[in-house]
């Protein structure tokens, strides 16, 4: 199965090929006017929305032509009604298998919906801490990071079945490559977790903010002055200085998913 990550705010991640989106061909509709979701190719944008005024939202951009998209506003509320909402300050979303997972800092911290219709499947308000991110492992299991560690999520029962032992403090972005999940810890660096045993097998010390998995499977972790590239099989790593003008900023202050992602079509990072 292939997971698709969606970052909060204004970061866009397309699920088709890597083509520039031409802004003047995206016709936005008026605020607060929800539009129904149409099954078609396109991409999602998760919004933290306006803290103190509204909960998080998700918009859907449906492709009408190779360079033309139609925006569908507040799509989750359209599918489920105005009383069904995401949590407070939604910062992360991921498509895994048949579901889409929305992670928020407070309130409805984990919302699971059908990836095609956006119909609600489950809402969890307690996951062990304030929500951060989700990574799918297989058809039965995923991990949810939060401010106090990493929760193990059973996809079939939509329930938290435990916490990763030894993972403490705020955990941000996570990525699956091979048989390991790599998770960024604000305090301790990178946790390497065996997905069969749900045990931490290595901790890579350092100060890092976010990570992504490249098309060839390498783990790229953003630090203060450069990348840490990790081989997912040997777990060997090397430091690579940022190209000039391409540093990745910290995402810990008011946590967000960061400004780093990888192409699914080419072996490049954005």
Each language-model region and where it sits:
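Bacterial Sec-dependent N-terminal signal peptides
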Residues: 1, 5-43
């Amino acid at each position: 199965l292939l997971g698709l990550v969606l970052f909060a705010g204004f970061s866009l991640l397309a699920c088709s090929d890597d083509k520039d989106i031409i802004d003047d061909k995206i016709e936005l509709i008026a605020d607060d006017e929800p539009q129904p979701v149409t099954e078609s190719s396109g991409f999602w944008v998760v919004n933290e929305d306006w803290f103190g005024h509204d909960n998080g939202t998700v918009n859907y951009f449906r492709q009408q032509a190779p360079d033309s998209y139609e925006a569908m506003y507040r799509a989750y509320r359209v599918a489920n009604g105005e009383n069904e909402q995401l949590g407070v300050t939604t910062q992360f979303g991921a498509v895994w298998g048949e579901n889409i997972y929305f992670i928020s800092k407070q309130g409805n911290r984990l919302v699971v919906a059908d990836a095609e219709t956006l119909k609600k499947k489950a809402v969890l308000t307690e996951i062990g801490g304030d929500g951060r991110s989700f990574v799918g492992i297989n058809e039965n299991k995923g991990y949810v990071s939060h401010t106090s560690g990493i929760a193990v999520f059973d996809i079939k029962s939509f329930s938290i079945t435990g916490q990763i032992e030894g993972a403490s403090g705020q955990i941000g972005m996570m990525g699956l490559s091979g048989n390991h999940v790599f998770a960024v810890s604000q305090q301790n660096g990178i946790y390497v977790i065996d997905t069969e045993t749900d045990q931490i097998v290595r901790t890579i010390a350092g100060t890092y903010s976010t990570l992504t998995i490249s098309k060839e499977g390498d783990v790229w972790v953003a630090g203060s002055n450069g990348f840490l590239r990790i081989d997912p099989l040997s777990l060997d790593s090397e430091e690579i200085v940022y190209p000039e003008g391409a540093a990745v900023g910290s995402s810990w202050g008011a946590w967000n998913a960061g400004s780093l992602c990888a192409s699914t079509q080419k072996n490049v990072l954005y």
